[in-house]
Amino acid sequence: MAALNGLVLLLLTISAMFISECYSSGESQSIQRKGQCEEVICHRKLNHLGERVTSGCPTGCLCVIREPDNVDNANGTCYALMSSTTTTTTTPDGTTTSEEEE
């Protein structure tokens, strides 16, 4: 009976180590931004008409500002927007289908 308890304890220890290794490797990977939006700073400020404007991000990027909405002068970070393409297919009988791909 003691040998069976030892075997169960050994199996639990091995499975706990395996699960711990799986979770710790996932936490250490960072999100890497690549492309035109990488390391681009954007700005929110008031223009000459007193309206809030956001500038600094290239086309296809979104400016994310981590300040409250009541703060007019703030800096943010540009992130790439998810892009999708549409594929249009025409069959021999003349029907057309469109599919969006991400």
Curated annotation (Swiss-Prot):
Complement inhibitor. Prevents complement-mediated C5 activation by binding to C5. Binds C5 at a different binding site than the other tick complement inhibitors OmCI and CirpT1, and the drug eculizumab. Inhibits complement in human and guinea pig but not in other species tested (rabbit, rat, mouse, and pig). Keywords: Complement system impairing toxin, Disulfide bond, Secreted, Signal, Toxin. It is found in: Secreted. Belongs to the RaCI family. Residues 1-24 form the signal peptide. GO terms for cellular component: extracellular region. The lineage of its organism: Eukaryota, Metazoa, Ecdysozoa, Arthropoda, Chelicerata. Expressed in salivary glands. GO terms for molecular function: toxin activity. CDD domains: C5_RaCI-like (cd22951). This is Complement inhibitor RaCI3. Disulfide bonds join C37-C61, C42-C63, C57-C78. The keyword Disulfide bond applies.
